Amino acid sequence: QTTADFVVDRNVLDLDALSCLVRALKAGAAMATIATALASGEEADPNCVKVVCAVNGDALYFSRSAIPFVRNPGHSGMLKHIGIYGFAVDTLRRFTSLEPTPLERTESLEQLRALESGIPIKVIIAHGAFHEINTPTDLERLPARWPAS
């Protein structure tokens, strides 16, 4: 049980991006997440999750593959998903009660469970560097980014 209005799950985060995420939830988003421009070389990295959005900012799909397919170079607009989620509490309760879905099992991406179950995910486009900790290599790089004081 919780008396919170929103729940956010993240290990290392830029506070401006967090503020944007919370604003989206306060504006009525059931679930929200953050994306940023994909850096060169990340297209083929399966540990770098990509997201494609509708014109209204809702996620259409997340994948470990390079999406969308870039037919015309220079027009990619590929987005890297930053693994933070904000939930309205009722949405979080619903989400955690759902069984894993076929696409979720295929890609090993839990956010696909939300999309397959009809839960819209608002995607906030943020700028700047985000340092995720998703793999042992990411963890090894952490001290270089945040040295002890």
Per-segment meaning from a language model:
Residues 1-12:
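Short beta-strand-to-loop acidic/aromatic patch adjacent to the donor-nucleotide binding site
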Residues 13-101:
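Conserved core of the sugar-phosphate nucleotidyltransferase
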Residues 76-149:
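Conserved alpha/beta core of the MobA/IspD/sugar-nucleotide pyrophosphorylase nucleotidyltransferase superfamily
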Residues 8-10, 40-41, 131:
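Alpha-helix N-cap/loop-to-helix initiation residues
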Residues 12, 17-18, 22, 29-32, ...:
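Structured catalytic cores of enzymes that bind and process phosphorylated ligands/cofactors
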